């Protein structure tokens, strides 16, 4: 109940995405957050199920559902249900789409020795390509997209908890992510900025094993005139754009900052940008590839 006894809107998260991208970990994470969870609810049952939830009188005010292509009537009914829910005041629906690079999904299938549900008699990559094509429109309608490439199950769980815990549900979130171009562009990024033109601490021997979180590396990256000019122009651009993204109803904006390996320059700049906007927006900073180069002692 609200402060005046009014029913609070039901928070509905529909978890979908690529097979092998982490939906099982996701639904378990929502259970840990106190959500009422159902795996593989047919879209035809969604309106009736939500009516029952509504009639419960806020006894189930947080609901997470896994929906995927195991339901053969998936698209015929899901899009219609989403359109109808968008017009209702008593429910706040969000689509969380889990994705990963094809090579990562293939590796996960090989590790578990599973076949792809859409192509059980074909190599996993054939099913992955078909599924990606079928889910393209749904991905375009998702409010939140997670790229689980390189994420361990624990890291995906932590990401979900940061996003969906009760104290975090205060609207628009800016997720500033550093990454290395050598490992691929994050597929969940809304905006991508390339900082490989900046001076590289990798070529300074004592900085090579460190990261952009270390003070001396950060100071080195930020001290250059071209860095300061870039940050000035980028922050000016983002300051202009962010209110419009927020107005469009996005719940999060993923800003990806990339350098060669994702260890030095992109890390320092991602931290700087997140700090700059933290007074006006809820911000989260993450470093996708920061530990990779350290692990191989490049």
Curated annotation (Swiss-Prot):
The keyword ATP-binding applies. InterPro entries: P-loop_NTPase (IPR027417), RapZ-like (IPR005337), RapZ-like_N (IPR053930), RapZ_C (IPR053931). It comes from Geobacillus kaustophilus (strain HTA426). GTP binds at residues 68-71. Belongs to the RapZ-like family. ATP binds at residues 17-24. Pfam families: PapZ_C, RapZ-like_N. NCBIfam families: PRK05416.1. This is Nucleotide-binding protein GK3066. Displays ATPase and GTPase activities. The keyword Nucleotide-binding applies. GO terms for molecular function: ATP binding; GTP binding. Keywords: ATP-binding, GTP-binding, Nucleotide-binding.
């Amino acid at each position: 109940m609200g402060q005046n006894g009014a029913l609070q809107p039901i928070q509905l998260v529909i978890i979908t995405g690529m097979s092998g991208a982490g939906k099982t970990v996701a639904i378990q994470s929502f259970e840990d957050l106190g959500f009422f969870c159902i795996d593989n609810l047919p879209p035809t049952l969604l309106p009736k199920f939500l009516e029952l939830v509504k009639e419960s009188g806020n006894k189930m005010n947080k609901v997470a559902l896994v929906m995927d292509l195991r339901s053969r009537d998936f698209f015929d009914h899901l899009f219609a249900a989403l359109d109808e829910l968008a017009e209702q005041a008593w429910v706040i629906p969000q689509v969380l789409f889990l994705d990963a690079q094809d090579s990562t999904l293939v590796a996960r299938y090989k590790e578990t020795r599973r076949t792809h549900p859409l192509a059980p008699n074909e190599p996993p990559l054939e099913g992955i390509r078909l599924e990606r094509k079928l889910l393209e429109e749904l991905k375009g309608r998702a409010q939140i997209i997670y790229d689980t490439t390189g994420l361990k199950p624990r890291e995906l769980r932590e990401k979900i908890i940061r996003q969906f815990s009760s104290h975090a549900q205060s609207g628009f979130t800016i997720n500033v992510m550093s990454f290395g171009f050598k490992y691929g562009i994050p597929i969940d990024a809304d905006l991508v900025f390339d900082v490989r033109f900046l001076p590289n601490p990798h070529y300074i021997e004592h900085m090579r094993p460190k990261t952009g979180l270390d003070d001396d590396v950060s100071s080195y990256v930020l001290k250059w005139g071209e860095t300061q000019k870039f940050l000035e122009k980028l922050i000016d651009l983002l300051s202009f754009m962010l209110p419009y993204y927020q107005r469009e109803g996005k719940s999060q904006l993923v800003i990806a900052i990339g350098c060669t390996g994702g260890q030095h320059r992109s890390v320092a700049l991602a931290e700087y940008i997140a700090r700059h906007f933290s007074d006006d927006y809820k911000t989260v900073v993450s470093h996708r590839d920061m530990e990779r180069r350290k692990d191989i002692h490049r």
